[in-house]
């Protein structure tokens, strides 16, 4: 599945038939997908940013490679096989000198054994949309709602010691709330949500 957005494709359309994630891609300044070339793929820029990141973070005391922890259910061979594919993708994409995926396991409860203890570097999760509106997705990442499951349960940004990260989440939350307040013009609502979503993706 080719996807440059956080909101799923095919969920929302503007009055002229434009699919919502196309608005997000436009806000990100990405060209239209031609069915072959990944629009965010820029190997030269990646190598430049990688070298810059290694230099800056090494000066801050970070050692490389960085190890990203990913958890699967113990005894679930399908999950382990998928994780190994992901590990290889990390290796092929980042290089083993930059970011390495470490696969770990939990026994019975990923929430109790991993998420609540903040042991994960990232998590792969998702669900089918409950209703056809960007709030269904973006509302999960705001910093001002107990209903923001992914922010509260997985992201933990509100608990971060980084003022910069907290400020970015506050800006994102403000954009989402402004979009959610538009109820009399659905095209304007979707445009505002696309702005918020692009902001989130630009700062991921």
Residue ranges with predicted function:
Residues 1, 30-42, 96-111, 136-204:
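Extracytoplasmic/peripheral linker and loop segments enriched in polar/acidic and small residues
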Residues 1-92:
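Append "and occasionally in soluble cytosolic enzymes with long acidic Gly/Pro-rich linkers
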Residues 61-64, 115-118, 201-203:
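Extracellular/periplasmic catalytic domains that process cell-envelope and extracellular macromolecules
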Residues 64-67, 95-99, 118-122:
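Loop/turn elements at helix/coil->beta-strand transitions in domains of secreted/extracellular proteins
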Residues 71-75, 104-106, 125-128:
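Active-site-proximal beta-strand/loop segments in catalytic clefts of secreted hydrolases
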Residues 76-80, 109-112, 130-135:
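Flexible loop/turn segments at secondary-structure boundaries
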Residues 84-92, 108-121:
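Short helices/loops that flank or line small-molecule/ion binding pockets
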Residues 122-138:
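Ligand-binding clamshell of periplasmic/extracellular solute-binding protein-like
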């Amino acid at each position: 599945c080719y996807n440059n957005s956080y909101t799923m494709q095919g969920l929302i359309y503007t009055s002229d038939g434009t699919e919502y994630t196309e608005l997000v891609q436009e806000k990100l300044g990405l060209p239209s997908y031609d069915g072959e070339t990944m629009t965010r793929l820029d190997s030269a820029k990646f190598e430049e940013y990688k070298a810059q990141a290694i230099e800056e973070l090494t000066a801050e005391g970070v050692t490389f490679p960085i190890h990203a922890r990913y958890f699967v259910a113990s005894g679930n061979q399908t999950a382990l096989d998928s994780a190994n594919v992901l590990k290889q993708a990390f290796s092929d994409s980042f290089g083993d000198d930059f970011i390495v995926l470490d696969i770990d396991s939990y026994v019975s409860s990923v929430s109790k054994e991993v998420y609540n203890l903040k042991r994960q570097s990232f998590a792969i999760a998702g669900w089918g949309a409950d209703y056809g509106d960007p709030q269904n997705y973006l509302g999960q990442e705001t910093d001002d709602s107990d209903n923001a499951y992914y922010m509260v349960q997985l992201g933990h940004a509100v608990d971060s010691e980084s003022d910069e990260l907290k400020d970015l989440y506050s800006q994102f939350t403000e954009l989402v709330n402004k979009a959610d307040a538009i109820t009399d013009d659905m095209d304007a609502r979707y445009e505002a949500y696309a702005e918020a979503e692009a902001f989130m993706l630009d700062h991921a």
